[in-house]
Amino acid sequence: MQEFTGVWVRDPRIQKEDFWHAFMDYEVCIHTNSLAFTKKSSCVRRRFSEFVWLRKKLQENALLITHIPKLPPKNPFFSLNNAKEIGARMEGLRKFLEAVVHSAVLLSDSCLHLFLQSQLSLKKIEACAEGRTRYTVSEAIHSFSSGHKRFDSLCEENMEEEQCVQCESE
């Protein structure tokens, strides 16, 4: 059987932080039969700044071994209401992830797997990848994966203390 990994970036949503500040996040889904992934299907929500963080992490971890694909350009005048701009950004993010998941060197990065298959915050992804949590990468993916909204810090701390068997935030 031939190995495949499909990546989708879809369902853009405006998230309001407060009256003056809002951002767009996207549903990032993968479907694969690759043994490199813990789960065969998953969906998480990520925002553009998190993709920027991921690219930087991949660059740091891969050093000069491989070329890191480019992200779509950051537009300071990006409109949350312009369907054409949003569509172009989603396509650019999809192409970035497609290139990343088809690179053997980048596919070995724990941050990538946690980014794609868990709803952990960037801070928690970093801590888990560096072995500074009580849970492994695989455990994090199973516990903090699709079907769950982002866990608040209290729930994440409970899991670290092995008290959070099935935390679902509403």
From Swiss-Prot:
Residues 4-122 form the PX domain. SMART domains: PX (SM00312). GO terms for cellular component: endosome; endosome membrane. This is Sorting nexin-10B. It holds the Pfam family PX. It is a peripheral membrane protein. A 1,2-diacyl-sn-glycero-3-phospho-(1D-myo-inositol-3-phosphate) binds at R47, K74, R89. InterPro entries: PX_dom, PX_dom_sf, SNX10/11. Its main location: cytoplasm. One of its GO terms (biological process) is vesicle organization. Probable phosphoinositide-binding protein involved in protein sorting and membrane trafficking in endosomes. PANTHER family: PX DOMAIN-CONTAINING PROTEIN (PTHR46209), SORTING NEXIN-10B (PTHR46209:SF4). The PX domain mediates interaction with membranes enriched in phosphatidylinositol 3-phosphate. It comes from the Eukaryota. Transmembrane segments: none annotated. GO terms for molecular function: phosphatidylinositol phosphate binding. Belongs to the sorting nexin family. Gene3D superfamilies: Phox-like domain (3.30.1520.10). Keywords: Cytoplasm, Endosome, Lipid-binding, Membrane, Protein transport, Transport. CDD domains: PX_SNX10. It is found in: Cytoplasm; Endosome membrane.
